[in-house]
């Protein structure tokens, strides 16, 4: 089963910008015995690593950039078949948007069950799938994980300057002596 949370997004003055919705799978209903701890636990950057990155960045006059990866979990593919039953309100929305009619005959008790293709907030394995997806991508663009903290990545730029990136779920902090490298990462 899933839930939908809707909240107002406001600017720094408190002025309404837009509504933000988040679908959350009912991971508490997943059978945890099907997964090993290493399939569900995702590392997060250590506070000491963040302090070290900031301290080093300041002492070396590096440039800083922080970022948020929008809808991060949806970038990771589900590895197993995970079924999710939509509540009646979400089923109604799905049917209204389903121009091909593929879900019309699959409704039971005003609900439809779907297969998740992408990781979704709330699934017990989603955080780990997202971390693996992101760390694999960072390796393809030249970053190496730090041996002490798996959420800190480093690479040398084409100008032989170091860029350091720290990840906490879908938030990141990047520092580099090479401002062009920060621009490339955007």
Model regions and ranges:
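Long, low-complexity, charge-biased intrinsically disordered regions
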Residues: 1-186
């Amino acid at each position: 089963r899933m839930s939908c949370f809707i909240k107002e997004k406001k600017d720094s003055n408190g002025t309404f910008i837009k509504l933000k919705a988040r679908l959350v799978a009912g991971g508490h209903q997943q059978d945890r015995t099907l997964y090993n701890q290493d399939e569900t636990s995702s590392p997060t950057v250590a506070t000491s690593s963040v302090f070290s990155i900031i301290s080093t960045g300041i002492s070396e006059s590096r440039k800083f950039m922080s970022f948020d990866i929008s809808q991060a979990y949806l970038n990771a593919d589900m590895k197993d078949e995970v079924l999710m039953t939509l509540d009646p309100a979400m089923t109604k929305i799905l049917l209204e948007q389903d121009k091909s009619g593929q879900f019309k005959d699959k409704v039971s008790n005003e609900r439809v069950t779907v297969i998740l293709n992408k990781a979704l907030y709330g699934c017990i394995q989603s955080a780990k799938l997202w971390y693996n997806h992101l760390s694999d991508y960072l390796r393809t663009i030249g970053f190496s994980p730090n041996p002490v903290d798996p959420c800190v990545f480093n690479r040398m730029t084409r100008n032989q300057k170091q860029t350091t990136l720290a990840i906490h779920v879908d938030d990141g902090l990047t520092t580099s002596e090479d401002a062009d490298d920060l621009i490339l990462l955007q």
